[in-house]
Amino acid sequence: MAMKRAIGLMSGTSLDGIDVALIESDGERIRLVKSANGLVAPLGPTGYRGYAEAERALLREATRDAEGLRARTDRPGRLAEAEDFVARAHAEAIEAFLAQNDLRPEDIDVVGFHGQTVIHRPKLGLTVQLGDGAALAKRLGIRVVSDMRANDVAQGGQGAPLVPVFHKALAEAAGFTGPLGILNIGGLANATLIDSGGNMLAFDTGPGNGPINDWMKERTGQDFDEGGATAARGTVDEDLLENLLGHPLILRAPPKSLDRNWFSHRLAGYLTVEDGAVTLTAFTAHAVARSLAFASERPARWIVGGGGAKNRTLMVMLERLLAAEVLNADAIGWSSDFLEAQAFAYLALRSLEGLPLTYPTTTGVAAPVTGGIVSEP
């Protein structure tokens, strides 16, 4: 199959903003260049559109309004307003990206549009990512693939994580072999484990940055714990940590996809700012470590992406608990900030080719299935 250009979009549950990334792929192979020192050159240009505080507030309110949803098409409260905003903001992000990189709509074969998750309840057969793919395609003049989780959930899968098939393809293109762990730490944390035979197991491990960010916002007004500096000054409350790690969703075996809102920062409410930050950080790290009970082989190397890769306190904890080499994705030429956006570009290309997005070992679906709704401009 011929290589195509795809743009991926990701707006995560941390509500920071919209990541934009361009890759070239045929839905299986990824165009990747290794430099003389063995690092991977960037897959393609990237961009970002941050959310203003009022925009974050709208998305937070829409997420609360979604708690009572029973049908995917219902839009009570501010959900309809938020859905219009999501499509508009993503269009603005791509338009700015194209202009900055001297690209035209006809240079792009497809856009992979994740949308904004407001509720994810696979046991109820319910997952909702706000964002009108048809409206986005019409405004941009580019084919759009959206709603990539729904088919997996309809077929009995967990609907998440979706990025493992991209992780595996990227690792293979970069020459990495198992046993390898690829960890993405956004609002939640999810792991892709590749054993020495190339077999893949993937699942959400537990909280990521979500509870830490919520804690910092509530207690300090800051959006996150920059570099893990606040946590570095604190002392872990071991009793609270053990209580948090007893959460039934942490103990549950894969397949496992989680909802960011299932892990609250408020259990740390009686602690100092520093002690709360470090205890919630330890919760994320220990949940990853305990997930290895489900692995056929312990990874000898971990590659960490997402916002959590910038939290030095968290990275030190992971290195100690995992007893393995732990690398920031940026250190090997990958992009810790844009891995998910790149993944949704890749998934959009797979969707166009009818290739599987999910597998029994990633979401628990009975057989590999494709997904996504294709909207023509």
Swiss-Prot record:
Instruction: Say yes or no: keyword DNA damage present.
Output: no
What keywords sit in the KW lines? ATP-binding, Carbohydrate metabolism, Kinase, Nucleotide-binding, Transferase
InterPro entries in the cross-refs: Anhydro_N_Ac-Mur_kinase, ATPase_NBD
Q: Name one GO biological process term.
A: amino sugar metabolic process
Q: Does the keyword Mitochondrion apply?
A: no
Query: Which residues of the sequence carry a binding annotation for ATP?
Result: 12-19
Q: What EC class does the entry list?
A: transferase
This protein's source sits in the domain of life called Bacteria
Under the GO molecular function aspect, what terms does this record hold? ATP binding; kinase activity; phosphotransferase activity, alcohol group as acceptor
Q: What is its EC number?
A: 2.7.1.170
- A Pfam cross-reference name: AnmK
**Which reaction is the catalytic activity of this chain?**
1,6-anhydro-N-acetyl-beta-muramate + ATP + H2O = N-acetyl-D-muramate 6-phosphate + ADP + H(+)
Q: In which pathway does it act?
A: Amino-sugar metabolism; 1,6-anhydro-N-acetylmuramate degradation; Cell wall biogenesis; peptidoglycan recycling
What NCBIfam families does the entry give?
PRK09585.1-5 (NF007141)
HAMAP family in the cross-refs: AnhMurNAc_kinase
Q: Any idea what job this protein has?
A: Catalyzes the specific phosphorylation of 1,6-anhydro-N-acetylmuramic acid (anhMurNAc) with the simultaneous cleavage of the 1,6-anhydro ring, generating MurNAc-6-P. Is required for the utilization of anhMurNAc either imported from the medium or derived from its own cell wall murein, and thus plays a role in cell wall recycling.
Task: Tell me its family.
Answer: Belongs to the anhydro-N-acetylmuramic acid kinase family.
Q: What is this protein called?
A: Anhydro-N-acetylmuramic acid kinase
* Protein species of origin: Methylorubrum extorquens (strain CM4 / NCIMB 13688) (Methylobacterium extorquens)
